[in-house]
């Protein structure tokens, strides 16, 4: 795409982060000599921006590339092409020493509150280590800062002397949030921070993130697959499918007027506790297409790998059968979503972009 959706002129706030035409491919290698036969297009030409103190939601089913986007932005994994600009500076062009400074401004809250905390380290060391590496605090000042961070995240100061296994999942995620705040960042990637938690705990963590955003002026890239959470937490929402953003709009517009077939299917599958009327269910038929792109001379190999995946019924037959069983159910075949044109603005809806299917 040539233009970044929701550019500064179209946004209510100036962007702190701008992603343009980002691609992250992983090589596919086969055979004894590990010949490079193709690529997994995990992220394929993604563009968006995040404003100051804004929360941008990134939603989609598992495997669509959401987490890869977040990790690529933070340079935790290498990118293939494209650019990421943070506070008007090119992140991918930064040297190792410059990247160390960026680390103070960009942090991540991980999905797994158990696996993201070293079980052999005390909470004091987990939260304090980043501050020691960046020489922010030492000695008694370090302990004071750790105690303050724990308190702000709903923990007790004395918890710093315990180990991760002594806490519940929700408490461990609070510790992960405190660690992310240790360096006073401006931008945080929240990689499904509540998906592994009980529903009763999810609201507490979300309220905490909102309070911290107001207090510290944070900007979030909020990665999730729970549309109910995204609806109440995010300012704008980008919908991903097979490595690309297929629709982007502010929260109210997206839920009021979804345009892309995949967005409609996602929203129709989400439970609604306060339905205003009968909602039509939209079903996605067929297997999820492979994100692997084989080179032309490997088409035969691709056919061998994908052999045996044909369903007993064709997608058209399944659609007809579903329609006969339930007239309130609409169907969309995944094959029809493979053609993904660039994002274009929606007429009379500023800030609403869709990969338009005709």
What annotation goes with each model-predicted range?
Residues 163-167, 171:
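Conserved ABC ATPase signature
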Residues 182-186:
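A short, proline-enriched helix->beta-strand linker immediately N-terminal to the Walker B motif
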Residues 82-90:
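Conserved ABC transporter NBD signature motif
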Residues 8-15, 28-34, 39, 251-358:
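Short catalytic/signature loops enriched in Gly
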Residues 61, 189, 193, 197, ...:
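P-loop NTP-binding/switch modules centered on Walker-like glycine-rich loops
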Residues 33-36, 91-107, 133, 254-258, ...:
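ABC ATPase NBD coupling module
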Residues 89-90, 141-158, 267:
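Conserved ABC ATPase "signature" region
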